[in-house]
Amino acid sequence: MAAELESSLELSFTGSGTVPGGGLPPARSRIFKIIVIGDSNVGKTCLTYRFCAGRFPQRTEATIGVDFRERAVTIDGERIKIQLWDTAGQERFRKSMVQHYYRNVHAVVFVYDMTNLASFHSLPSWIEECKQHLLTNDIPRILVGNKCDLRNAIQVPTDLAQKFADTHSMPLFETSAKNPNDNDHVEAIFMTLAHKLKSHKPLMLSQPPDRDQIHIKPEPKPAMTCWC
């Protein structure tokens, strides 16, 4: 993969690039890598699953290492692939993967649990980690408060989160990956980034990411509920 933070160009055919029957080659897609960052159990995996699969996962395993999902969208007639990279929040699972995780990032989604004040207070450390890996403020960033459906358990008020978002020049979204009524809201989070990236990132020819290198399969473990 190229070192520059530019969108990569994927060809939907392989080999010599010729098309059977001599027809026109298939359309090409720009690929944008968006990383989803936050403490464990804030609902990162469920948010990415909701956007890519259109539904809430009933059961899931804890993320170990790095995983990603992708979805193709069409914006202004252009087909774009959005890759959502999700990583384990625990430090012991991140040490060996963090350098690869931050490579060629186009945008960042910071996620906290609205019912867990500690996850909100961890946000500065996640922002600092991004800075340490040379992700500047020029890269589009969004702040997401998850689990807004648990109204009686909210610990992070909107005004506090909005002040933090304004300080760091990020838009704030409050949503629920679980509540089907918030499906359009989850959609808006990632489509907002997709529109920004489409408008500002030039086209560059690059090899698409190697799935074998970035999709880390966890060891078999008992299934657990996705708390989001």
Swiss-Prot record:
This is Ras-related protein Rab-33B. Belongs to the small GTPase superfamily. Rab family. It comes from the Eukaryota. A motif (Switch 1) lies at residues 54-66. It comes from Gallus gallus (Chicken). GTP binds at N41, V42, G43, K44, T45, C46, T60, T63, G89, N146, K147, D149, A177, K178. PANTHER family: PTHR47978. It catalyses: GTP + H2O = GDP + phosphate + H(+). Mg(2+) binds at T45, T63, D86. The gene is RAB33B. It is a lipid-anchor. Keywords: Autophagy, Golgi apparatus, GTP-binding, Hydrolase, Lipoprotein, Magnesium, Membrane, Metal-binding, Methylation, Nucleotide-binding, Prenylation, Protein transport, Transport. The small GTPases Rab are key regulators of intracellular membrane trafficking, from the formation of transport vesicles to their fusion with membranes. Rabs cycle between an inactive GDP-bound form and an active GTP-bound form that is able to recruit to membranes different sets of downstream effectors directly responsible for vesicle formation, movement, tethering and fusion. RAB33B acts, in coordination with RAB6A, to regulate intra-Golgi retrograde trafficking. Its cofactor is Mg(2+). Switch 1, switch 2 and the interswitch regions are characteristic of Rab GTPases and mediate the interactions with Rab downstream effectors. The switch regions undergo conformational changes upon nucleotide binding which drive interaction with specific sets of effector proteins. Although most effectors only bind GTP-bound Rab, ATG16L1 effector binds both GTP- and GDP-bound RAB33B. Interacts (GTP- and GDP-bound forms) with ATG16L1; the complex consists of a tetramer where two RAB33B molecules bind independently one molecule of the ATG16L1 homodimer; the interaction promotes ATG12-ATG5-ATG16L1 complex recruitment to phagophores. Interacts with ATG16L2; however interaction is approximately hundred times lower than for ATG16L1. Interacts with RIC1 (via C-terminus domain); the interaction is direct with a preference for RAB33B-GTP. Interacts with RGP1.
